[in-house]
Regions:
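Short intrinsically disordered coil segments
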Residues: 284-293, 486-491
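N-terminal leader/targeting and assembly helices and adjacent pre-domain segments
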Residues: 1-164, 287-413, 448
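Contiguous, non-catalytic segments that form substrate-binding/exosite surfaces or channel walls
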Residues: 123-214
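Catalytic toxin/effector domains delivered as secreted proteins or via bacterial secretion systems
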Residues: 325, 395-501
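Intrinsically disordered, low-complexity boundary segments flanking structured domains
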Residues: 101, 105, 111-112, 203-210, ...
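Acidic, glycine-rich two-metal-ion catalytic cores of nucleic acid-processing enzymes
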Residues: 185-288
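Intrinsically disordered, low-complexity acidic/polar segments
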Residues: 279-280, 328, 480
Length: 501
């Protein structure tokens, strides 16, 4: 069983990664808004705005794709650690009942659950990249159009309009998901929910699978102060997984296990452990009642822990909002004095709140990533633009050979990953430097094709060309490489790779 405190710490590393990405994206938007040429006809503005928005979208995709490898590694490690922690406590219960749970590594069912949980959450993050690019680009278009209208119609002077636009973007934060209702989640909110939900659901399914192996039906649900009211109704109880018990309520029907709003759903920190008749219960009625008591007081107002935590989150959002504004205005070369003063004010408000309630600060919830000076922001924006142009399409030399974006032939043991950058063309050496392998990546940054100048030391398996030169087509299915069939090079491939053949 995972404790709520464990789950609250789980997303810290991922949030730190994405907080910096969010700040980079917001600063880039602010710089573009500040440098835009507003004194142009409306028709020209529409075309130019779409061009700017397209570049913003590509920059967002490029920035978030740089996190893909680190995100995948972090998620896999989090899943394995959380699964180990959850099953360790459960297995101790089973052993006390005279049962003998096998190691996780020896259970094919548990390994499948672990892999499925990782793949589902990794897929959520891949989708997050696309939805963020779409949502944030829409934000940028609206902001730029609003500034244009304010300036050209005379509603505001140039500086006031730019400042107002950047302030509004900073208030909203970089949108990651936009719902049909109009509500938008920021990157920080989306990342936290994805990690907590993904890790907890995977751990719970591992516990479920283990309970099936052990033939266990009853579970005790965890309880904690600060639970949302709908979850407080069923936390701490004993339930029947099968729903067949006459003594204990149905686990799924009562807790909503398996649904977004139920146990193990969106941002839920509840868990469960196996329970057998004769075991003592962890939570009695008095303790559960105490969890719902109004034990906190702030400025004379009595609060439950849930209400106190909601107020703490509100204050943290205020700190993040002004930090974002300070960094964005500085990147755009505008005065950020008001934002700096507001940060001081909200930090003071947070200290007062924590002193009155006794709650602890959570640094990850007020972090927004490191800001840039105007010159640094301009330099970074220029570098990003060059990076985007470099990987915007395949490019060719005058003699018809393809342009190599990444020459890694001087690197020792370079790792050519399955996913890299869109339209990348990477050269590496193999066979002790005797063979060149050229990897092409597609528009989504996934391996597409490899051209090799030799037979990989195995001419029987690669009986192609004069010297074993050949191509491998990379076949993908369900997000994985499933095959790499070899074939002869086409005439066009020979032409564009003539510089290595």
């Amino acid at each position: 069983m995972l404790k709520p405190e464990y789950l609250q710490r789980v997303p810290d590393g991922m949030i730190k990664l994405y907080a910096q990405a969010e700040m980079d994206i917001l600063e880039n938007m602010a710089v573009r808004i500040a440098r835009y040429g507003y004194w142009i006809p409306a028709v020209e503005h529409q075309a130019k705005m779409l061009e700017e928005a397209g570049m913003v979208r590509e920059e967002i995709l490029a920035r978030l794709k740089t996190l893909t490898g680190r995100t995948d590694r972090e998620l896999r490690q989090l899943m394995q650690e959380a699964g180990g922690v959850a099953l360790k406590s459960d297995d101790a219960v089973y052993r006390r009942q005279g049962l003998n749970p096998p190691p996780v590594s020896a259970s094919e069912d548990l390994q499948k659950v672990l892999q499925a949980g990782y793949e589902k959450t990794a897929g959520t993050f891949r989708n997050l990249t696309l939805t963020t690019a779409r949502t944030a680009t829409h934000q940028f278009e609206q902001a730029l159009d609003r500034a244009y209208m304010q300036i050209t119609l005379g509603g505001m002077d140039y500086n006031t309009a730019i400042r107002s636009t950047i302030k509004q973007l900073s208030t909203e934060g970089v949108g990651a998901i936009r719902y049909p209702t109009g509500r938008t989640d920021t990157i920080e909110v989306a990342v936290r929910r994805a990690v907590v939900t993904g890790v907890n659901q995977t751990a719970l399914r591992l516990q479920d699978a283990r309970a099936d192996e052990m033939g266990a039906d009853l579970v005790e649900v965890s309880a904690h102060a600060g639970a949302r009211p709908s979850h407080a109704q069923w936390q701490g109880g004993i339930y029947s997984r099968s729903g067949k018990s006459k003594k204990y309520p149905d686990f799924v029907k009562t807790t909503g296990y398996g649904t977004g709003a139920g146990l193990g759903g969106w941002n839920c920190s509840h868990s469960f452990r196996p329970w057998f008749e004769g075991m003592s219960r962890t939570y009695d009625k008095a303790l559960l009642k105490e969890y719902q008591a109004k034990d906190y007081e702030y400025n004379g107002v009595k609060m439950t822990e849930y209400e106190a935590l909601q107020e703490q989150r509100r204050i943290e959002r205020g700190i993040r909002r002004w930090k974002r504004e300070q960094n964005a205005l500085q990147a755009a070369g505008l005065d950020s004095g008001e934002a700096s003063a507001r940060i001081t004010e909200w930090n003071r408000r947070q200290r007062d709140f924590l002193e009155q309630t006794g709650l602890k600060a959570d640094g990850t919830r007020v972090a927004v990533g490191k800001g840039s000076t105007p010159k640094e922001a301009e330099r970074v924006a220029l570098l990003k633009q060059k990076e985007i142009e470099k990987y915007s399409q395949y490019r060719y030399n005058k003699n018809g050979t393809i342009v190599v974006t990444d020459d890694w032939t001087k690197k020792e043991h370079p790792k050519v990953s399955a996913e890299y950058k869109p339209y990348a063309v990477v050269d590496v050496l193999s066979q002790k430097g005797k063979q060149t392998d050229r990897m092409y990546y597609d528009a989504d940054g996934r391996q597409l094709r490899q051209v090799s100048t030799g037979a990989h030391g195995n001419p029987k398996r690669h009986p192609y060309g004069r010297n074993g030169e050949h191509a491998h087509d990379i076949i993908w299915k369900d997000g994985k490489i499933v095959d790499r069939p070899a074939r002869e090079l086409t005439e066009q491939e020979r032409k564009e790779n003539a510089n290595i053949l």
